[in-house]
């Protein structure tokens, strides 16, 4: 795992400060034991605690995105469980990313995934479907 916060939160992998400990969907829901959908509804309703957690999450995600952009200089597609909820927050996230990126003046390289759920399963299925079609 990539370290986001040296000496930070303990990650399930055993290390401390991994990006996963700060940017996984569980960061948003573990304390309240609610679903991600319930959490995002609270954010929409401007629930104080949910908004605070969301802003911290977006800040950590922005740092991670900026680091990845600096390292790889390529488009970044945001997926996973949270990716399906990011479309309405891309302007805010893009602005946060720009705070950490002194070399670029826009975040057009930042994209939201097309598949809102189970994107990896769709990708695997697509691979085998294409292979099958070639045999016809």
Ranges and model annotations:
Residues 1-4:
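Short, intrinsically disordered, charge-biased short linear motifs at domain edges
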